[in-house]
Amino acid sequence: MVDEADPKGNPIGTELVYEDDSVRVWRIELAPGEMAGWHTHYLDYTTVVVEGDVVERPNADGTVDRIEVTPGAIMRWNQGTLRHALRNIGSKTFRNVIVEVKGRRTGAREAPAGA
């Protein structure tokens, strides 16, 4: 089992940019056609889309989710056990910021517009 305290063993993004006792902040940047590695979210997290148009999320169970993204969109997710990856299938570079919340379980929901 991967230790959630060690992000090197389960990288959520392409770069870990900040970490303290409360949060861990990742950046993802994927060129068109590029794929981020397989990982599992062991902490609740919030994503903020910076740039991009469409990505797909292949899941370990064989399903694939197509996700149209809008810059500025904010989504909150609960930790999960389904291993997945992320591939940029759009025509623009995909940039995303992920904030993992340590020690808190918020449940999945979309943030209200303007939040």
Predicted regions and their residues:
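Basic/polar N-terminal segments that are highly enriched at the extreme N-terminus
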Residues: 1-12, 104-115
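A short glycine-rich, His/Asp/Glu-containing loop-to-beta-strand
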Residues: 9-37, 44-47, 96-101
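Short beta-strand His + acidic residue motifs that chelate non-heme Fe in jelly-roll/DSBH
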Residues: 36-38, 56-57, 83-90
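Glycine- and acidic-residue-biased ligand/ion/polar-headgroup-sensing regions
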Residues: 42-61
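Short acidic-glycine-tyrosine-enriched beta hairpin
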Residues: 61-80
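Ligand-binding loop in jelly-roll beta-barrel domains
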Residues: 79-104
